[in-house]
């Protein structure tokens, strides 16, 4: 639900006010005061909107309005109020008796704004124009410095990555050259396969005590059976070992059977065994 219209638009006049309408409005306000602007047009016998009557009275018909140009004091006051209040023309008009907000706004845009620019003052910020440009230049310079520092940082990181890749490449080439020099200095026969050196076999140093195995016992028994024949053979001289008759110099311990040497028999028995 919005506000109801102040009057019926179908039965209201629009456009410029006539002299008769101005006289009726002034006479009614002098007699009855401003009152309610919604009911005032009907009471004054005007076919006008209440808003139109209010603006006509405030901006043109009220007796305390000042006519003529603005003075220098009014110009300075408008500039000071604008620096504090901004474009709130109704509040500025309340501090200037006899001046309307619409009149002050038009005067600002046509005269005071140009006057401030000619003095080198920004009409929006009320500061010198050179200072405003200097602050803009400083901000742009700071942004350029920040961008340059950021670019330098990126370049430094990129250079570090390039140096790391270069160092890795040199290390790989150095290892390849070292392996090639080792392969040339050590032949294939010395290193086995030509690439890896010979390794010592893994020795089991765990000691344990266990009875001898059966194969070792059999080997020891065979050695005991062979030892007597070897001893007899070792007790013969060269002539007796060949079966020759015993001489006076012979000192062999072998016995004779029927005047025959038993050396050959011993050898046969040894061979049979």
Curated annotation (Swiss-Prot):
The keyword Transcription regulation applies. Expressed both in roots and aerial parts. The keyword DNA-binding applies. Residues 167-195 are annotated as: Disordered. It comes from the Eukaryota. Residues 37-61, 89-112 bind DNA. InterPro entries: Homeodomain-like_sf (IPR009057), Myb_dom (IPR017930), Myb_TF_plants (IPR015495), SANT/Myb (IPR001005). SUPFAM superfamilies: Homeodomain-like (SSF46689). CDD domains: SANT (cd00167). GO terms for cellular component: nucleus. Pfam families: Myb_DNA-binding (PF00249). One of its GO terms (biological process) is regulation of lignin biosynthetic process. SMART domains: SANT. It is found in: Nucleus. GO terms for molecular function: cis-regulatory region sequence-specific DNA binding; DNA-binding transcription factor activity; sequence-specific DNA binding; transcription cis-regulatory region binding. Induction: By wounding. Triggered by MYB69 to repress lignin biosynthesis. Keywords: DNA-binding, Nucleus, Repeat, Repressor, Transcription, Transcription regulation. Residues 9-61, 62-116 form the HTH myb-type domain. Transcription factor that negatively regulates the expression of caffeic acid O-methyl-transferase genes (COMTs) and of other genes involved in the biosynthesis of lignin, thus preventing lignification. This is MYB31 transcription factor31.
